[in-house]
Amino acid sequence: MKSKRRSGCPLSASLDVFGDRWSLLIVRDMMVRGYRTFKEFRTSGEGIATNILADRLEKLEAAGIVETEPDSDGRRVGYRLSEKGIDLAPVLLEVVLWGARHEKTSTPAALLEQMTMNREAFLAETRRRWKDRDLTPMIPRLDMRRRHKNE
């Protein structure tokens, strides 16, 4: 699913792949929560509509970020990050830290400190878990209700 690029700018090309409202949240759920199924993504707490979720999963697969494989029961399709997808780990980490620094979030301070002080270890553990197909959640499910800086 190649689309015409606006320019040769790497940032523009990257945003063409994952610059919408939902794609990085789907990647986050796969990377740190171990989500693999459509149903798991629907219950993430973000409120994504089923048609949008299906579209984003299809686009992420077409872009080579996500791969599909039969689920353990063989009745459904499961999703897994590709090598290209796991390479987004540093991007997600920096976006999380930026958001925590500039917006009111529900992320525990201890977790943010760990991510800040031990960036390389956090990224190495993320990659190891992906390589080993370890699907246990890396971080606890956080309160995903909308929060505003002035609350």
Indicate where each model-derived feature is located.
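A general structural signal marking secondary-structure boundaries and capping sites
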Residues: G34, G64, G99-E103
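A detector for short, charged/polar N-terminal pre-domain segments
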Residues: M1-R6, P10
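Residues within the helices of the helix-turn-helix
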Residues: K39, E58, V77
